C-alpha cells in the first residue's frame, strides 16, 4: 500500500492540472504560433514558467485505485496487476478469465 501522503499528493496534482489546464493550453498555443512576435512568445514562456510545477499533466503518475501502487498499473482497469489478478480470480471483472492453452 502506498503511503496516504503519496495518494494525497497525487490528488493535489490532479486538482492543479484541472485548475490551470486552460491557462497552460493558451500559453502553449501562443508559444507554438509562428505568426506571433518573438517578444510575445518570450513573455508567454516566462508566464508558463511562473505556473506551479505540479500543474503540468506530465507530473501525474497513474496509481492503483485500491492500493495506490504506482508500478504495474493497467490503464484499462485502473488497478495494479496484483489487485487485478485478485479481482479476476474472485470473478469480479466481467469477461476476464484466466488464460489456458
From Swiss-Prot:
Per the record, GO CC terms?
A: cytoplasm; small ribosomal subunit
The record's section on InterPro entries has: Ribosomal_uS14 (IPR001209), Ribosomal_uS14_bac/plastid (IPR023036), Ribosomal_uS14_CS (IPR018271)
Q: Quick check: keyword Ribosomal protein in the entry? A: yes
Q: Which UniProt key words apply to this protein?
A: Ribonucleoprotein, Ribosomal protein, RNA-binding, rRNA-binding
- Which GO biological process annotations does it have? translation
Record GO terms (molecular function) = rRNA binding; structural constituent of ribosome
Note the subunit structure: Part of the 30S ribosomal subunit. Contacts proteins S3 and S10.
Q: Which NCBIfam families has this protein been placed in?
A: PRK08881.1 (NF006477)
Q: Which family does it belong to?
A: Belongs to the universal ribosomal protein uS14 family.
Name the job this protein performs.
Answer: Binds 16S rRNA, required for the assembly of 30S particles and may also be responsible for determining the conformation of the 16S rRNA at the A site.
Q: What is the name attached to this protein's record?
A: Small ribosomal subunit protein uS14
Organism for this UniProt entry: Alteromonas mediterranea (strain DSM 17117 / CIP 110805 / LMG 28347 / Deep ecotype)
> Which taxonomic lineage does the organism of this UniProt entry have?
Bacteria, Pseudomonadati, Pseudomonadota, Gammaproteobacteria, Alteromonadales
Name of the encoding gene: rpsN
Amino acid at each position: 500500500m502506498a503511503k496516504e501522503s503519496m495518494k494525497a499528493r497525487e490528488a493535489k496534482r490532479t486538482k492543479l492540472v484541472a485548475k490551470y489546464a486552460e491557462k497552460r493550453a493558451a500559453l502553449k498555443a501562443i508559444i507554438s504560433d509562428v505568426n506571433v512576435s518573438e517578444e510575445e512568445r518570450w513573455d508567454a514562456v516566462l508566464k508558463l514558467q511562473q505556473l506551479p510545477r505540479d500543474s503540468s499533466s506530465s507530473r501525474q503518475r497513474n496509481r492503483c485505485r485500491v492500493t495506490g501502487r504506482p508500478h504495474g498499473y493497467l490503464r484499462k482497469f485502473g488497478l495494479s496487476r496484483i489487485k487485478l489478478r485478485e479481482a479476476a480470480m474472485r470473478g469480479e471483472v466481467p469477461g476476464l478469465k484466466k488464460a489456458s492453452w
